[in-house]
Amino acid sequence: MGCYSSKNLKQSKRTILEKPFVDIGKVYILGDELGQGQFGITRKCVEKTSGKTYACKTILKTNLKSREDEEAVKREIRIMKHLSGEPNIVEFKKAYEDRDSVHIVMEYCGGGELFKKIEALSKDGKSYSEKEAVEIIRPIVNVVKNCHYMGVMLRDLKPENFLLSSTDKNATVKAIDFGCSVFIEEGEVHRKFAGSAYYIAPEVLQGKYGKEADIWSAGIILYILLCGKPPFVTEPEAQMFSEIKSAKIDVDSESWKFIDVKAKHLVNRMLNRNPKERISAAEVLGHPWMKDGEASDKPIDGVVLSRLKQFRDMNKLKKVALKVIAANLSEEEIKGLKTLFTNIDTDKSGTITLEELKTGLTRLGSNLSKTEVEQLMEAADVDGNGTIDIDEFISATMHRYRLDRDDHVYQAFQHFDKDNDGHITKEELEMAMKEHGVGDEVSIKQIITEVDTDNDGKINFEEFRTMMRSGSSLQPQRELLPIK
C-alpha cells in the first residue's frame, strides 16, 4: 500500500520547492521526536524569534525516489495551505528546504493521539457512551466533509492520522497527515492503490475509486468505536481484502447487542459497498444518530474499550517478538536471503524499490498482480521510507520462512521470560513492553487473558507460539514471496 512511487531518481542539486535553501536550525530549535512516517520524521520545535512551539516534519530527499515522490511532497504542502483555517485540520505555518531535506512546519498538537480521548472518556471503571462516540467521530467526518467540499480526497483516513490539539478535556481533534491526499474533481476516478489495510474501501482494492472511499474509512473507524475492532481482521491480508470486497458486515452479533439501531443504520450506510449509494459526509453529520441529543448516553459495554486497547497493542507485542527473532538469525541462516536480496537489488543501492521488487518476483516465478506487489512492499517496508533495506527484507521473508521453526520462536519467548522459568508473567511482559514503549497495565493484562488459554495467569511457550502463528497484521503479504 502507501502513496508513493519507487522509481529511482538520481539526486540533483535543483530544489524541490524551487526557492532558496534555508538552514532550519537557524530559525527553529529542533526538539524531541514526535513520530515517523513514510518519508521522514516529525519533531517538536520552537521558533527562535517568538518562542512558540510547533511541529516540524522533516522529509529526507534521499527518501524521494522519483519525480512522483517530489510532486507528492509539493502536493502535500499545497493541500495543507489550501485547507488552512479549517478547525479540525492542523494549521500549516511554512515549508523550508535545505540541501538534504524538506521541512514542513505546522501547528503542534500537544494532546497526543486520538485514542487518548477515548481513554479520557472512560473513567471510574466505566466505558464511554454512544453520545461520546459521536464526539469522536463527528470531527473526523467533518474533516472529510470539508476536504471533499474543498476538492481534496484524503485516501488514508485512520485514527493514527488524528491528534488532540492539547491535553484539555475539550481539546480539538485535528487531522495531521495529508501525504496520501490528492486534489479531486467531482466524479473523478482514481486508480492508484493507496490507504491502510483495515480501513481501505472495496473499490480501492478494485482499482477504481473516488472520494466516497473516505466515507468507507470513516465508517470503519465508527465501527471500531462501537464494537472495539474492525469488521475484517482475517489473515492473511489477501483473505481480509477478499472479505472487504464481499463478506457480510456484522452488526448483529453479541458485540452489537446493546448498540442503538440508529447507529447500526448509519454504519451500514457508510459501509455500503456501492460507492454511488454510500452516504455522503454531509449526510452522515445530519443523520439522526449524529444529531445532538439523539445518541444514547448509556455507556457502551466496557469490553469494547478493552478490545480497542488490545487491537492496538497485540500487533506491537508481535513486532517486538519478530525483531528478536530477526536479530538472532545467524549469518548462515540468512546467507540465502542476503543472496536473494542482492539478486533483486539490481542497481546495488542497498535497498529494493517497488520496480525492483516487481521485476525480481517475476524472475522468481511469481505472478502477483501490481496491487499485490504494492501490498507486499507496504508490508515489508517497516520504516515506511518507500524502499526495503536488508533488515526489513530478512524480517519479511523470514516471517513465513522462520515462524514454523520452534527454536526461533523460543528465542523470542526467552526474551520475555527473564527468569527462564518457562513462563512469561505479567511483570515480565510489562517490563519488555515498556522497554519498547508499548502497552499499559490494563492492555497488558488483556493480552495475557487473550493468550493465556489455560488460565494460569502466565503465558507458557505453547501459548506464545500459538499467538505468534495466529493471524496478525504482520503475516499477510510477506507470505506471497515465493520462498520455500
From Swiss-Prot:
This is Calcium-dependent protein kinase 31. The keyword Lipoprotein applies. Residues 28-290 form the Protein kinase domain. The keyword Lipoprotein applies. It comes from Arabidopsis thaliana (Mouse-ear cress). Residues 295-325 are annotated as: Autoinhibitory domain. There are 3 contiguous domains conserved in the CDPK subfamily: a kinase domain, an autoinhibitory (junction) domain and a calmodulin-like domain. The autoinhibitory domain (295-325) inactivates kinase activity under calcium-free conditions. Induction: Early induced by salicylic acid (SA) treatment. InterPro entries: CDPK_Ser/Thr_kinases, EF-hand-dom_pair, EF_Hand_1_Ca_BS, EF_hand_dom, Kinase-like_dom_sf, Prot_kinase_dom, Protein_kinase_ATP_BS. Disulfide bonds: none annotated.
